[in-house]
């Protein structure tokens, strides 16, 4: 075997359907916004009820997926984590950067439901996912608390969530434009401060695509105010 050219093939078993049509605004890690729900729709070869037998006994799942919008021809051994302001380089294997030799992501999500009888076969609903709509999924595995939870673990340069949650102000007339079942998720996403960590201009207006809407907002101090909500073009 030639280790210089060794490769492997993986199969896309499913795609996720989420409220994010672009990368901006997606929580930086899974589980930060539990109100976010997404659906896992299997590709035709894997639309098997039998493949999900026993899954209902678990509360959380691991998703193994592809950073499909972050492909690069060449990889770099160091990257600039946004958490550090984009100015400091760390080894790619010491980060969760999408720009990796293999653009593979790993997310822990809550199992919110299983519908075995849909026109597209069995569909899994999950909560707390940090994936863009259409992201390819390579595998699904159950989360095992006794093996996967390590209270003694160290978090390196990211021992805790970045910064405090923002207070979110959505004027009533704008909130009325958001479907009722999406309001708590939108508030949760905005409270995480979707801005790049190096941008703090209180006059700047940011736009985020969410659930078919274009949500524009400003941030001043620890307060985020939504200034417009329109249908996504």
Question: For each of these PLM feature ranges, what is it?
Answer:
Residues 1-104, 116-125, 129-233:
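Mixed-charge, low-complexity intrinsically disordered regions
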Residues 17, 109-112:
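Conserved positions in beta-strands of structured domains
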